[in-house]
Amino acid sequence: MNQQDKEWKEEQSRIDEVLKELEKKERFLETSAGGLKHDIIGLRKSFWEDVKVNFDDAHEAIETMASIKQQAELLSDREHNHRRMDQQLKRIHQLKKSPYFGRIDFIENGEEQAERIYIGLASCLDEKEEHFLIYDWRAPISSLYYNYSPGKAEYEVPGETIEGEMVLKRQFMIKNGTLKAMFNTDMTIGDEMLQEVLSHHSDTQMKNIVSTIQKEQNQIIRNEKSKILIVQGAAGSGKTSAALQRVAYLLYRHRGVIDAGQIVLFSPNFLFNSYVSSVLPELGEENMEQATFQEYIEHRLGRKFKCESPFDQLEYCLTETKGGDFPTRLAGITWKAGLSFQQFINEYVTRLSSEGMIFKNIIFRGQKLITKEQIQSYFYSLDQNHSIPNRMEQTAKWLLSELNKLEKKERRKDWVVHEAELLDKEDYLDVYKKLQERKRFSESTFNDYQREQQLLAAIIVKKAFKPLKQAVRLLAFLDVTQLYLQLFSGWGGKFQHEKMDAIGELTRSAFTDNKLLYEDAAPFLYMQDLIEGRKKNTKIKHLFIDEAQDYSPFQMAYMRSIFPAASMTVLGDINQSIYAHTINGDQRMDACFEDEPAEYVRLKRTYRSTRQIVEFTKAMLQDGADIEPFNRSGEMPLVVKTEGHESLCQKLAQEIGRLKKKGHETIAVICKTAHQCIQAHAHMSEYTDVRLIHKENQPFQKGVCVIPVYLAKGIEFDAVLVYDASEEHYHTEHDRRLLYTACTRAMHMLAVFYTGEASPFVTAVPPHLYQIAE
């Protein structure tokens, strides 16, 4: 037996020993969990039997409440323990398939013998709970595996740096408890393991792969010193994976201090949320809060306006370029996206401190109780040294006081008498009870008609005034819409736009139709918050923004203002800047962080696609030279010329059939717009089964789909077929980024179809990087 065979046998023997220990723990947990489940069912059934209920007097009531509380706490404790055991069992089931993926032998300075450290998805102690059989990949010592080759190495623990020497680094592939591959490596993560992982087919859920975390990704995951971490990464470089693993690391590292509810991920769309939803549970953690910026807008303004989505805005910009309002709309989108527009609003709100506030009349039953001029007069009578939000609060208090006075006067009006006549018996009984409580008269004097009518009037008017008072408390007397529109009448100072009048007219037209354009949403909310003084969210400790290039500088600055206490991890790729504000605008992700210390990380190496696909796609970019493909070989990309849409759909169907035979499970026909998707789907359905995805709330499923490029962002497919990459559809710089984004969704196969003349971004690719099919 040679040395390699001997080591293989030793490692398999250790795997077997670890599996035995895992099975012991599994049996113990299953028995304990079963007993707990039985207890929980029993407690639920007998809950009220074990509680002594007596509300006869105050003392008995207190005892009853204490008994209920005690029983509820007992049940809650049992349920919590059962959930914890269930999570532990799930973790053990995962570990049984593949207990660990790496081993390092590390000699700490001052020690003589190396410690063997096996690294896996979760930690596992021996039977006596004294020694680690497996270290969690997030443990401080595990960072050695990701950061170092054999030689001098160190890792951080709280308050100390542990130095020493790594004398061995070994990687494993273990499937269902059997050692399939083992190799020592001088690299951070060996190419053999990456090749194995990356050769798999795409799925409807993002894979959790902690065994192949690269050194540069590990620096993102474990970074705790940077308040703001900005990651610029090429398509397929592992940005999103690193972000989700960073969430898992933070939850592990700060267990008991931070929970999943204090971490928010802003992601591009619902489809993406569905795609990444399984990663954290697979890592043994609860999912963090996930939202899209559009969901936040709808939450704040959806009852007031029909809110345009970023997809509708982009669809407009891609399909309505010949419309008369298009140049004005595009100029408005670009202006409202920038930080200069934020300064424009800041100057405007400063001016509102002394003039220009617009209020609404307070109307009751068609009559003006308090006019907007009266409210404005009171507001500006207050000390101007006080902030606008402070004066708004004082104005609301004054209005409530005035309404209380008016409410008393209203009781004598004729409509109140009429309303009293319409009251049913229950209302009269309620009045009788209230009168008794006040001891104004007894049963023998209940015929005191005058007092009865007074109380009835008070109740009727109070009920009628309640919505008014509630609206005042919510500051609804402020006319935020007119204040925002007034902004375009030259009130914003030096940061005006040369087309401001036309932009203002277009904005007014949208508001007249009760429509909030996407480019107006963040500025509108920002201005409203400055005036009303909305409370900041200090509960959120970490904010993750994926596909950050999709957000305008204004939107990024606004999100920063919403979560001022949060650390931020911002991830994106400027080459995938496809949304409307980037057509003629700023594409930087860091524009709003210039006043805060931020750390920048660049991920150049891309792992998603084969080397052939990466070489093809990077050639489409002007600055793609520094993108590094991982050396995974595959088919050459295919460029297919077709004669018209009928031929295009036929050839697409043929290619889909070929790809299915090769075993590809997720195939995307990617179009430029949703409108094009609908047309393509109608034509292609005659030749093959294909699913149309053109709304963001549709789930991602296996099979063949037709999807617009902006909904495919952040997702990967086994094969991508680009629908009609002709010069007609892809010729501007913005189109270049759209086409690049579409092509970089492919893992194993890329085919680009076109009619007429090919896009200049396709013809710019050197011919030796693709194959041509007629």
UniProtKB/Swiss-Prot annotation:
Q: Which family does it belong to?
A: Belongs to the helicase family. UvrD subfamily.
Q: Which GO terms describe its molecular function?
A: 3'-5' DNA helicase activity; ATP binding; ATP hydrolysis activity; DNA binding
Where on the tree of life does the source sit, at the highest rank?
Bacteria
Residue ranges occupied by any UvrD-like helicase ATP-binding domain in the UniProt entry: 212-610
Which parts form a coiled-coil structure per UniProt? 3-31
Instruction: Return the protein name.
Output: DNA helicase IV
Q: How does it assemble?
A: Interacts with the RNA polymerase core.
Ligand binding (ATP)? G34, G35, L36, K37, H38, D39, G233, A234, A235, G236, S237, G238, K239, T240
Query: Where is it located?
Result: Cytoplasm
This chain's function reads: Catalyzes the unwinding of duplex DNA in the 3' to 5' direction; this reaction is dependent on the hydrolysis of ATP.
Under InterPro entries, the record lists:
DNA_helicase_UvrD/REP, HelD_bacillota, P-loop_NTPase, UvrD-like_ATP-bd, UvrD-like_helicase_C
Q: What is its EC class?
A: hydrolase
Keywords, ordered alphabetically: ATP-binding, Coiled coil, Cytoplasm, DNA-binding, Helicase, Hydrolase, Nucleotide-binding
